[in-house]
Amino acid sequence: MENKKTIYFLCTGNSCRSQMAEAWGKKYLGDNWNVYSAGIEAHGVNPNAIKAMNEVNIDITNQTSDIIDANILNRADLVVTLCSHADSVCPSTPPDVNRVHWGFDDPAGKEWSEFQRVRDEIGERIKRFSETGE
């Protein structure tokens, strides 16, 4: 069944938040959605994001850090920006793209507990979306 919708998680560096969101998205939405993530820049997958997801038995070592792909962006059924208010640069999207904003703090460079907190918050948000469509 290839009539899947496409969801595209975006943040600044495609290093932490959008990587975790992609993994949670594949877990909770993978049956009905093609799940992608990207950033304005590609900073590489943060080792602590990999470690945090491993704690919940999700392996993201094969995910790549990617710059926003206009083809995916323009055909996505839903674009989700994950930047916090503290981020000065959050990806902009074309006006015709269905975009929502789910803001999460950037754990990069912070305490380990921040990675765990943000991981859990993103997981809960995507789980709720999978159950309610909102």
Swiss-Prot record:
Which cysteine-cysteine pairs are annotated as disulfide bonds in the entry?
A: 11-83, 83-90
The Swiss-Prot or TrEMBL record annotates one GO molecular function as: arsenate reductase (thioredoxin) activity
Query: InterPro entries from the xrefs?
Result: Arsenate_reductase_ArsC, Ptyr_pPase, Ptyr_pPase_sf
Which GO cellular component terms are attached? cytoplasm
SUPFAM superfamilies associated with the record? Phosphotyrosine protein phosphatases I (SSF52788)
Enzyme class, top EC level, equals oxidoreductase
Which SMART domains does the entry mention?
LMWPc
Q: What is its main location?
A: cytoplasm
Active site positions, chain numbering = 11 (nucleophile), 83 (nucleophile), 90 (nucleophile)
Entry annotated with the keyword Disulfide bond: yes
Q: Quote the CDD domains the UniProt record gives.
A: LMWP_ArsC
Q: What is its EC number?
A: 1.20.4.4
An example GO BP is: response to arsenic-containing substance
Stored Pfam families:
LMWPc (PF01451)
Q: Where in the cell is it found?
A: Cytoplasm
The keyword RNA-binding belongs to this UniProt entry's keyword annotation: no
Q: Quickly give the catalysed reaction.
A: arsenate + [thioredoxin]-dithiol + H(+) = arsenite + [thioredoxin]-disulfide + H2O
Tell me which family the UniProt entry assigns to this protein: Belongs to the low molecular weight phosphotyrosine protein phosphatase family. Thioredoxin-coupled ArsC subfamily.
**What is the protein's known function?**
Catalyzes the reduction of arsenate [As(V)] to arsenite [As(III)].
What's this protein's name?
Arsenate reductase
> Which species does the entry assign this protein to?
Bacillus cereus (strain AH187)
